[in-house]
Regions:
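Extracellular/luminal immunoglobulin-like beta-sandwich modules
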Residues: 55-57, 100-125
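Well-ordered beta-strand positions in beta-sheet-rich domains
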Residues: 32-34, 74, 115-119
Length: 140
C-alpha cells in the first residue's frame, strides 16, 4: 500500500512540475506591415511564459533591451512588460525604415531563445512618373 502511494505521489509531482514549467513562446507573433512614408508603424510582439530579455533587431542589427533605442530617435519599444508585450513603434517612417525586423527573446534558466520575423515596407509618398517622348520628325 505504501509503495502504491509513493508511486502515486511521484507521478503527481512529475505532472505538477511538467505543467508548471512551459517554454516561453510568442503569444502575438509580429506581422509584416506596409505603411506610407511619414506614417507610424507598430510591430507587435507578445511573449507568454517570458523568462529571457526581449529586444528587436533591424536587418540583423540588435537594437537593445531599452525602451529608448540609442541612435534611433524615432523608434521606441513599448508595451506591458508584466504581460510580455514588447511592441516596436516607428514614428514618421521613412524609406530607411524599410527592412526586416525580428523580435528576439533571449534564453533564461531552461528556456530556449525564440525569434520571430516581420518585414516593414514603406511606400514612397510621392512617385516620379516619367514620360517617354517619341522623337518628332522635322519637316522641311
Amino acid at each position: 500500500m505504501c509503495a502504491k502511494i509513493r508511486n502515486l505521489i511521484a507521478v503527481f509531482c512529475v505532472l505538477v512540475v511538467a505543467t508548471a514549467f512551459q517554454q516561453q513562446y510568442f503569444r502575438v507573433v509580429p506581422r509584416s506591415l506596409r505603411v506610407q512614408e511619414g506614417a507610424e508603424a507598430v510591430l507587435e510582439c507578445a511573449v507568454a511564459n517570458l523568462a529571457g530579455q526581449v529586444q528587436w533587431a533591424k536587418d540583423g542589427f540588435a537594437l537593445g533591451f531599452s525602451s529608448v533605442i540609442p541612435g534611433y530617435p524615432r523608434y521606441t519599444m513599448f508595451g506591458d512588460r508584466r504581460h510580455g508585450v514588447y511592441n516596436l513603434r516607428i514614428v514618421n517612417s521613412s524609406l530607411v525604415d524599410d527592412a526586416e525586423y525580428q523580435c528576439q527573446v533571449g534564453p533564461a534558466q531552461m528556456h530556449k531563445v525564440i525569434r520571430a520575423n516581420a518585414s516593414l515596407t514603406v511606400i514612397c509618398k510621392y512617385s516620379i512618373l516619367s514620360r517617354f517622348r517619341t522623337p518628332t520628325k522635322l519637316v522641311k
